């Protein structure tokens, strides 16, 4: 990792601590295991987390549309099973966190804390029983949409983004508030994001998004939504995707 980080960079990240609010590495781990490689967390990801000073990483489980609708939950289970198996195999260096107290303890022990997230609510199906079950497994963050329209709301890539949060989406927000699962609006349409912020009694976040005022892109947030997230007690995680930063 020397080509990316200097010694000064490493010392700075060690002192301030880095929280990676969104990382898609569970998909890479699942693919590697399908290919017969069972140690990619240790061999590839952990060295990068260490080099970058990452103390907390949100592991985002994403289900491709080819698994919709019937196999969406099955794919999410595959991803979670693969991820948790590799975390368990590397328990001296990385550990699943279920609470703030867990994160603090894990970091004090010099380990990386992992929080589980679901990117897109398709694995939940048409009711909230899977949400409750996934919470028991450690789910602590959830995006109700990923780009497209779901049963729960409208994504940010829909050409017709009218409709916002649906009735089951509102029930999901209420249940997430009750369980302690954070709502992530990163891939929600403007209307859906506003509806979530109005419906949620708990802090709302955008785990990976930038300011639309600086780069006019549907994945970025309006000033109105950014201010509402801040007012809720939530945060916005900046994302270093070139097209979300500049047209150049």
Please provide the spans of the model-predicted regions.
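Active-site core of metal-dependent hydrolases
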Residues: 144-225, 237-244
